[in-house]
């Protein structure tokens, strides 16, 4: 049996790690009287969750080209509690503001109209932001059916005065599910204003740590034990015995650059009502694949073979492979300069439909974009155009027997994502695909262990 670890011990260990390892400032906001405003947060209303001084100074620093009155007016839009909206709708709206900024209009010194995006967070340079861990912050309840007057989260992680991460802790002898059922659920009901800006929630009793989104059910919360490598050996029994699960999550996700990367590129909404978070293996795997993409892209134009092979992204069955594709494509579109086209190739109608729907339902592709060709002829036409995304069955690369497959595009910024690329029965179709897209790069996704001939087939693709 693991030694008993109190909630306070877990909290203090986390704050120490956040301060000395992850680069956070730490603020203890506890007061004996919940209504006491003298808690160090700088708030003038206990219903507020934003830290006004931190928020304002960061916004002015990150947007020197925007007049101060315009900045302050924009921040008022962020502060709005959006009481007429559902919590998930409010969170989705603010998620867009955090990621893309707040659109503002103003006149410059010469009276010329200007339009800018006011940045709340600098996602490209962590050092330009302020990271703060606030513990024991009393918040006045605003929920219509609130069960208490005040609530006090254990730890909140702030970036530029904006609470992005909620952390609820329990003694090590308390079942972790109670942190979800008894705390997080009640907090969303009682202090919904805290979750309008929330990126994700963390629950821990040291023996076990899980994270999830504000829309996630308990069974959708997941662990985070690997730090840098999907192949890292994990001794779960030893981690539970030592009570270090939260330390591993902090090391793997709370480092400042990683936290910003996760919030910017690994959080999305599905059908506008379900908030989806990348799991541990997806975050590491997508970033590894993206690093390979950037490395291959840096090869000289003479090294065409190296540029065209992006490797294999291996997934266990049922571990969110199609969402990994979504995260991968979205991050490249957002972070890399280029006019990329992604062609997602599968061999079954159900897979093609599932992957397309996940791209569609996350807003990564639009219904009006006409990204699914109906037949081989339409596929060839699509690939000759400058579409951002195309989803197709490999069978649509069929061509008249004995005829040479035509070159459809010589662009070198086409990326073909091949699902289950080890399947060997499509050799001639794969040859047609390569002939039609001679300069494309290839990334293979598979959920099946590769052996012998299958490994060779996948190697030829990626």
Give the positions of each predicted feature.
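ATP-dependent helicase/translocase motor core
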Residues: 1-341, 350-366, 385-388, 395, ...
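Proline- and acidic/polar-enriched loop/turn elements at helix boundaries
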Residues: 29-31, 371-372, 447
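Conserved residues at beta->alpha junctions
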Residues: 170, 346, 420
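Signature of the SF2 helicase/ATPase Hel1-core->accessory helical subdomain module
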Residues: 176-177, 213-215, 222, 395-405, ...
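A generic local structural motif
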Residues: 187-189, 329-331, 375-378, 401-405, ...
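Conserved helicase motor
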Residues: 346-349, 369-378, 394-399
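Conserved motor-coupling elements within RecA-like helicase/translocase cores
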Residues: 374-390, 407-408
């Amino acid at each position: 049996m693991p030694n008993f670890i109190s909630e306070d011990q877990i909290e203090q260990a986390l704050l120490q790690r956040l301060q000395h390892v992850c680069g956070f400032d730490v603020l203890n906001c506890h007061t004996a009287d919940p209504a006491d405003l003298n808690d160090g947060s700088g708030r003038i209303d206990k219903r507020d969750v934003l830290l006004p001084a931190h928020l304002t100074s960061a916004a002015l620093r990150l947007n020197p080209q925007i007049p101060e009155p315009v900045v302050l007016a924009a921040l008022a839009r962020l502060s709005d509690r959006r009481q007429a909206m559902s919590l998930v709708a409010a969170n989705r709206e603010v998620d867009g503001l955090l990621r893309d900024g707040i659109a503002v209009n103003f006149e410059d010194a010469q009276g010329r109209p200007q339009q800018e995006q006011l940045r709340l967070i600098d996602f490209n340079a962590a050092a330009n932001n302020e990271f703060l861990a606030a513990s024991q912050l009393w918040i006045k309840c605003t929920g219509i059916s609130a069960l208490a007057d005040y609530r006090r989260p254990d730890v909140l992680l702030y970036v530029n005065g904006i609470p992005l991460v909620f952390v609820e802790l329990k003694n090590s002898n308390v079942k972790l599910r109670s942190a979800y059922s008894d705390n997080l659920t009640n907090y969303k009901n009682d202090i919904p204003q805290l979750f309008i800006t929330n990126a994700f929630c963390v629950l821990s009793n040291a023996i076990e740590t899980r994270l999830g989104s504000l829309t996630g059910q308990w069974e959708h919360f997941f662990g985070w034990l690997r730090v840098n490598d999907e192949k890292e050996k994990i001794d779960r029994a030893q981690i539970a015995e030592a009570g270090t699960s939260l330390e591993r999550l902090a090391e793997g996700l709370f480092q400042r650059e990683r936290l910003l990367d996760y919030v910017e590129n690994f959080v999305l909404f599905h059908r506008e009502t379900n908030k989806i978070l990348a799991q541990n293996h997806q975050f590491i795997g997508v970033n590894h694949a993206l690093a390979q993409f950037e490395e291959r892209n840096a090869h000289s134009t003479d090294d065409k073979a190296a540029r065209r092979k992006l490797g294999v992204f291996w997934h266990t069955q049922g571990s969110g492979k199609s969402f990994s594709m979504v995260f991968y494509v979205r991050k490249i579109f957002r972070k890399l300069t280029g006019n990329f086209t992604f062609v997602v190739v599968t061999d079954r109608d159900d897979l093609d439909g599932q992957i397309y729907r996940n791209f569609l339902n996350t807003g990564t592709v639009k219904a009006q974009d006409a990204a699914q060709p109906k037949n081989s002829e339409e596929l060839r036409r699509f690939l000759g155009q400058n579409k951002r995304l195309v989803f197709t069955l490999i069978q649509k690369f069929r061509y008249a027997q004995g005829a040479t497959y035509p070159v459809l595009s010589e662009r070198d910024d086409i990326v073909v994502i091949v699902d289950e690329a080890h399947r060997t029965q499509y050799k001639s179709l794969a040859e047609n695909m390569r002939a039609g897209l001679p300069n494309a790069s290839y990334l293979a996704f598979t959920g099946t262990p590769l052996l012998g001939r299958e490994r060779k087939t996948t190697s030829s693709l990626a």
